[in-house]
């Protein structure tokens, strides 16, 4: 995350960070304070990211979100966060395996009933699909997936196994800027 924050800062761009708070990355959670202070949006993703656990039922999903909020509360105002991204996206099919075909529609309704907003992506950097893609491959993936779209929500991952994402970020930002795009957090985009 320090490299991603540095790249965003150098470009004067703010992003939205959908947070995972599993055991392997809890040591990085203090960086959320820095990210929020720099003007980035902090949003919810998952405490465990274990599909078989979180998608067993609505109760299991919300238990995971409550645990996530508990884990990030020392670093940001977790209770004020109203944006989330479902693991696998809002149209994922893996949730059906564990919670049935009605689970995702139910969860989307429950998010909205809470006055929250769920966010999906329409451009994927494909930086977490395995094989450790190069920075150039990530860049090309983003450009290809953007195509003729005028409004893009780009999914990128920031983890120990996706370090080339941070390397690709300056070129991706430059490409979007050169092609007339503006950069907004999800909060500003939906406001």
Where are these regions (language model features)?
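Glycine-/small-residue-rich active-site loops that bind phosphorylated ligands and cofactors
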Residues: 23-24, 91, 161
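Alpha-helical scaffold elements lining the catalytic groove of polysaccharide deacetylases
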Residues: 50-76, 92-151, 165-167
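Catalytic grooves of carbohydrate-active enzymes
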Residues: 143-185
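Active-site beta->alpha N-cap acidic-glycine motif
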Residues: 1-86
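Short amphipathic alpha-helical segments and helix-helix/interface helices
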Residues: 5, 29-33, 105-109, 170-173
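Conserved small/polar residues in nucleotide/adenosyl-binding loops
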Residues: 189-190
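Active-site groove signature of glycoside hydrolases
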Residues: 83-85, 90, 155-156
């Amino acid at each position: 995350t320090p490299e991603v924050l540095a790249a965003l800062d150098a470009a004067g761009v703010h992003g939205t960070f959908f947070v995972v708070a599993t055991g392997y990355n809890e040591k990085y959670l203090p960086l959320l304070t820095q990210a929020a202070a720099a003007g980035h949006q902090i949003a919810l993703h998952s405490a465990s990211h274990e599909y078989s656990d979180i998608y067993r039922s609505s109760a299991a999903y919300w238990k995971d979100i409550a645990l996530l909020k508990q884990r990030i509360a020392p670093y940001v105002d977790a209770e004020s966060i109203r944006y989330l991204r479902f693991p696998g996206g809002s149209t994922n099919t893996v949730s059906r395996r564990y919670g049935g075909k009605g689970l995702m529609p139910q969860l989307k309704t429950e998010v909205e009933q809470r006055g929250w907003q769920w966010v999906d992506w329409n451009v994927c950097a494909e930086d977490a699909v395995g094989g450790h893609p190069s920075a150039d491959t990530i860049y090309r993936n983003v450009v290809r997936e953007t195509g003729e779209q005028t409004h893009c929500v780009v999914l990128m991952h920031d983890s120990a196994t996706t370090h080339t994402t941070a390397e690709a970020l300056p070129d991706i930002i430059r490409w979007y800027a050169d092609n007339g795009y503006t950069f907004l957090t999800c909060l500003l985009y939906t406001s």
